[in-house]
Amino acid sequence: MSSNQQPVVLGKLGSCHGIKGWLKITAYTDSVEGIFDYSPWLIKENGEWREVKVIQWRYQGKAVVAELEGVTTRERAQMLTNCEIGILPQQMNALPEDEFYWRDLIGCEVINTTGYNMGIVDQIVETGSNDVLLVKANAKDSFGKVERMVPFVPGQFILKVDVQGKQILVDWDPDF
């Protein structure tokens, strides 16, 4: 699988439910049901991605469980516990030109308004008020920083996002 075809992880398979191979689902989508909008899924089993189809799913108390094609026993389901669930990037909804997915920001250089290279976006954290970029500082950072946290607030701290050029322009003090 080429790097631009690497699956986008949307969740993971949890523990078994019952004796007929059903599995609990942990979804990373905005709503739990959102993960079922995509078909087929890719499951990462023993380090390899393989295609699988969801036959049916339902709420079971507060959990969501699913029946997967080819998984008909508890023993087989146990082998899939904790496997990642992914989809191909082209299965994701197309976005307007000025929007992007979080995954598109990972690896972007973060430059402030004075031209200082603050580092590379390593991950994004969702907080109650706004998302936060966790920026891994360059090895020889002038301010001795290892990591920076930059609030993702467009127009205030985030001035420009260039997904194609892998750069984010920020109004942020590099010593903060």
Swiss-Prot record:
InterPro entries: PRC_barrel-like_sf, PRC_RimM, RimM, RimM_N, RimM_N_sf, Transl_B-barrel_sf. It comes from the Bacteria. It holds the Pfam family PRC_RimM. The keyword Translocase does not apply. GO terms for cellular component: cytosol; ribosome. Signal peptide: none annotated. Disulfide bonds: none annotated. It is found in: Cytoplasm. HAMAP family: Ribosome_mat_RimM. Binds ribosomal protein uS19. This is Ribosome maturation factor RimM. It comes from Shewanella oneidensis (strain ATCC 700550 / JCM 31522 / CIP 106686 / LMG 19005 / NCIMB 14063 / MR-1). The gene is rimM.
